[in-house]
Amino acid sequence: MSESLNYYVTAYYRFTKLADLPAIQKALEDKAEELNVKGLVILGDEGYNSTCAASSIESFEAWKTFIREYFNSPDQFFKDSESTKSPFRRFKVKVRNEIVTTGIPGVMPPEGVNHHLSPTEWNKVMKEETDYVMIDTRNWYEYKIGTFKGALNPNIEKFTEFPQYIEAQGIPKDKKMLIFCTGGIRCEKGILELQDKGYNNVFQLDGGILNYMKEYPNDQFEGECFVFDHRVAVDQNLQPTTKFGLCPHCGQPSTIKIECKRCDAHELICEDCIKVEYAKDTCSKNCAYQLEKHPARKGQKQLVPFEIEKMKAEGKDTGSIPQIRVTRTKYISLNKNGEAETRSTKETAE
């Protein structure tokens, strides 16, 4: 890996029966603190789903070794990349009924291969075959910023709507169907649902878009890939997007640049919120609220946690950052570790 990049990132998951989730959660949290690993782990009875990052290659590799050994999964598949931007501010474990929200808890994908296509096999189908249908299983906003050539857009808000979409299309049960998602985990359950409904000629992209772009950048996938962390999206080289931001009003990917009428900050707004009064002219919900109440009054620039992390990643001085008021009762400041922290009172973060 290049020494010029600041963060090493890996995405991984595994469907496996787990017990004593509180003990597992503590073990993960303790190890992450020891190695200074940041990230998110979704933990459940059916397994784990995670993206984590570290600023040193030693900690990065040690974390992956720990995961393999702790979960007794020597063949654990990690989708590694590098980033100039910190994907996470902290490490967090969330315990949920499903490690990926599909609406079909209790369904356990089988061990091994279930109609998986490697990136090479996927490319071969796309370039040499014509009698198939390809469907993007992700949400509409993920599709919008990037997808495979010729992929259909289900235009869904959540994955639980996907099986109903397939049935409504009247696709023949024996038609060759290719499905894909960001990292592969949604398709692991999605393909089971389709097979249960009689679609037995369905194939899924092994490792998802992230695995494909690592092997075939600038090939059959067009645009960028949305990710659920502070990078927002990654480009064809798996680097943090320079094009998209998250709309401060609704959280959707955004590209429209505005200058806040209240605090003069620059922000990216989505196509929907740019049509909404007060939202279209402001960089945050707080500024929108204040602009509506006091149209002629200017205010202090808003500074959100990931902007502080960006300043740190760029080597800028954060020691003089003031506490920033983001709502009537919430402030952002730096704690003793130099991390952004939201507090409910105006006092120094500990």
From Swiss-Prot:
Q: Which UniProt keywords apply?
A: Oxidoreductase, tRNA processing
Please give a single GO biological process term from the UniProt record: tRNA modification
Record EC number: 1.14.-.-
Q: Which reaction does it catalyse?
A: uridine(34) in tRNA + AH2 + O2 = 5-hydroxyuridine(34) in tRNA + A + H2O
Entries under SUPFAM superfamilies matching the protein: Rhodanese/Cell cycle control phosphatase
**InterPro entries this protein is in?**
Rhodanese-like_dom, Rhodanese-like_dom_sf, Rhodanese_C, TrhO, TRHO_N
Q: Which molecular function GO terms apply here?
A: oxidoreductase activity, acting on paired donors, with incorporation or reduction of molecular oxygen
Span of domain Rhodanese: 128-221
Which residues does the Swiss-Prot or TrEMBL record annotate as the active site? C181
Question: Is Ribonucleoprotein there in the keyword field?
Answer: no
Query: Which Gene3D superfamilies did the record assign?
Result: 3.30.70.100, Rhodanese-like domain
* Family per similarity comment: Belongs to the TrhO family.
Role description: Catalyzes oxygen-dependent 5-hydroxyuridine (ho5U) modification at position 34 in tRNAs.
Protein's name in the database: tRNA uridine(34) hydroxylase
> Which organism is the protein's source?
Bdellovibrio bacteriovorus (strain ATCC 15356 / DSM 50701 / NCIMB 9529 / HD100)
State the organism's lineage.
Bacteria, Pseudomonadati, Bdellovibrionota, Bdellovibrionia, Bdellovibrionales
